[in-house]
């Protein structure tokens, strides 16, 4: 598979603090990749810069050969850690909004997944449980036919049933040419869907590795993560 995302010498400063420090990374299409680190490690900062929401202090990001900007936003689907949807909106209005705003939005696929959740399209977002709201937002993001999906902590704060639905939704909506980058600190829960992973800490890239190669050595991603972080 070809490299769909290239990050070179990426640094992001917030006043006197450094959010990312000289990160260089290349990720391939057709993979589900874990961006793994503790809270405050720089995961969200990196995702926001790939999505074009934050500008780097220095360094470059290219998505499918293009510098991050208006054109790359058309092929990048981003799930933020915190919702940006108004709680008073009805589900059908949110679907209409996504269909109007994104040319690659697959309404039929979104409706199919929402039906499997038992979500009434006339329901207001605020009437749904937290877990169901999280699932609805993921359905919307994964119903775009994007080349890159950026998912920021998609399974945080939801119950085990909701987590299983979220992971199944990610798996069932992957395509051979898309790349899914999942940011999380809940490594044991997500590692079963990963093809490879990246460890990040204090804004610095620690390592990148294939999951299958790690398993051949007799370790899990969660075990390696604990070992690496204990040594630092």
Label for each model-derived stretch:
Residues 163-176:
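Helical segment within the ABC ATPase nucleotide-binding domain
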Residues 59-72:
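Conserved ABC transporter NBD signature motif
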Residues 149-153, 158:
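Catalytic Walker B motif of ABC-type/P-loop ATPase nucleotide-binding domains
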Residues 81-136:
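ABC-family P-loop ATPase nucleotide-binding domains
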Residues 51:
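Helix-to-loop junction immediately C-terminal to a conserved catalytic motif
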Residues 38-42:
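Walker A (P-loop) phosphate-binding loop of ABC-type ATPase nucleotide-binding domains
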